[in-house]
């Protein structure tokens, strides 16, 4: 296997951690929104410092990336380190399913037996459904994402093919995102075959979903996001965000690992967050929750704000931005 989390971490933490901030030229964003205002720069500097503090104080390994979908600015730390994905890898499986569904009309409505097994612990939905139950392919995918159910995930891997998921990841430019094993296959995991990705690739995938830049139709892209926005169980990466703000979300957790990936539809300031931890303590929730809270507070301050810091209704601000972009 080409995956060595420990080697990546040792290399990373032999050097000084650097906080990287990029003003990205993202084609989907209006030119008129990219001006870096002095007070915005000061707020971002404080946000960067807060994220760096979470990294410095965390006992294990921490990585994060945040993308402002209004002006394209990114705040990143340790974003190129390859880490265990846990269940966040399931987002790439969902994308590959919809890619194949466009080539196979009716696939999503087809029924499949839903059977748990020893490998997946006979838990989750397997305890609720009878042995001869059948579920539609799309519903299995929703169970995989929204309940993070391992039987559903393994059924989806069988459905679309592990190699096809990886080929599609490469085609999307996700060089480090690799599906190497089924869920709860600890023997493959121990042998170095864990599912893995850099935080940067996680951010790229979520950005592609947010902007509908996927190898699927706009309708399929919208459906992928709708599935990810179905309310999910509590998670420290999602909990700081008010319930009335839609979040396309996927969490992942293993012993030592706690991850949260999301697209937050904050009015007038939508943003993406990728928060990954590894080699973590028994309960990394405080760090994950704190980083997410810091991000939500930062983007909330920018939402609906004029360049002088006062706030106006979101619809008024949207019109002002559109008018400014049109005048360029």
Regions picked out by a protein language model, each given a short descriptive name:
Residues 117-154, 162:
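Conserved catalytic neighborhood of penicillin-recognizing serine enzymes
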Residues 61, 133, 154-211:
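Mid-domain, small-residue-enriched loop/turn segments at the edges of structured enzyme/sensor domains
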Residues 7-17:
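Bacterial N-terminal signal peptides that target proteins for export
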Residues 17-25:
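Bacterial N-terminal signal peptides
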Residues 32-54, 159-161, 205-235, 244-246, ...:
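Structured C-terminal helix/loop/strand segments within mature extracytoplasmic catalytic/sensor domains
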Residues 31-81:
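Beta-lactamase-like hydrolase cores
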Residues 69-70, 108-125, 160-161, 226-227, ...:
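Acidic helix-start/capping segments at beta-turn-to-alpha-helix junctions
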Residues 72, 83-112, 273:
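Active-site SXXK
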